[in-house]
């Protein structure tokens, strides 16, 4: 299976690298192996210009089946040799601006935290036309404290916003909004902790495990974290709200 995966990667890389405006191709594997339910291969294609339209791309990958293209976000998804691939075409100038100015466009980290920077920093490079990726990674390693402070302020405010929503949902006994606000709260709480540790966030699939391994965590964090995540009918929503309060206060105090 490993060989089949690498052959498929080579095929896809061979197609993408022929496009003049593709500068760098980076891979991340999700899941421990092919039989892991989380398994798929994510391909980040950093571009300096236009890419072929979706109907053209569909015909360029030999053997690809179940091809789907998301026009709004410039993403392709398909199977090749039964292996799930997801390709995202990214504007290289966007990252240049972010890294050189140290300022992020509004909403840049809203939904996935710093995961896009994690991908840029830790993905496996399978093609590069220039030294752009090497320089970008140097810039990521040299981000100053002002950048991290900016992120902490933004993520902390969002965490507190979700905490307020969580308590409102508990008071109204709104089960759907309770789930939405619980998810938003714990996700942004993790975002704050990664920023405090000057680390970029992994994917949601790895977030719980890597959060537990962070060097700087509040006292009693792990027990509260596990209590908040645990599905336990005996833990009332109001009690979970109190756990969320304790988590938030301890994180803000770091």
How would you describe each model-predicted region?
Residues 4, 63-170:
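Conserved NTP/Mg2+-binding pocket subregion across the NTase superfamily
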Residues 6, 10, 131-254:
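Conserved nucleotidyltransferase catalytic core and NTase-mimicking acidic/glycine-rich helix/loop elements
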Residues 1-109:
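Metal-dependent nucleotidyltransferase catalytic core
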């Amino acid at each position: 299976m490993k060989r089949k995966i690498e052959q498929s990667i080579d095929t896809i890389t061979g197609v993408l690298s022929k496009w003049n405006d593709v500068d760098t191709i980076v891979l991340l594997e999700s899941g421990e192996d092919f039989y892991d339910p989380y398994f798929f291969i994510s391909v980040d294609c950093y571009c300096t210009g236009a890419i072929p339209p979706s109907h053209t791309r569909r015909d360029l990958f030999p053997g690809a089946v179940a091809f789907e293209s998301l026009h709004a976000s410039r993403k392709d998804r398909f199977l090749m040799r039964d292996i799930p691939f997801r390709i995202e075409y990214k504007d290289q100038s966007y990252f240049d601006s972010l890294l050189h100015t140290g300022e992020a466009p509004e909403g840049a980290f809203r939904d996935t935290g710093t995961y896009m920077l994690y991908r840029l920093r830790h993905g496996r490079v399978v093609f590069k036309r220039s030294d752009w990726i090497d320089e970008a990674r140097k810039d990521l390693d040299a981000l100053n404290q002002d950048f991290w402070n900016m992120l902490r302020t933004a993520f902390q405010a969002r965490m507190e916003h979700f905490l307020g929503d969580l308590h409102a949902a508990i008071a109204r006994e709104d089960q759907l909004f309770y789930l939405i606000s619980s998810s938003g709260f714990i996700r942004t709480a993790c975002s704050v902790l990664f920023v405090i540790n000057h680390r970029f966030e992994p994917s949601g699939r790895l977030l719980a495990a890597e959060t537990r391994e962070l060097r700087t965590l509040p006292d009693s964090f792990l027990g509260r974290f596990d209590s908040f995540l645990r599905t336990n009918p005996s833990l009332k929503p109001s009690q979970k709200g109190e756990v969320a309060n304790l988590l938030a206060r301890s994180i803000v105090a770091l």
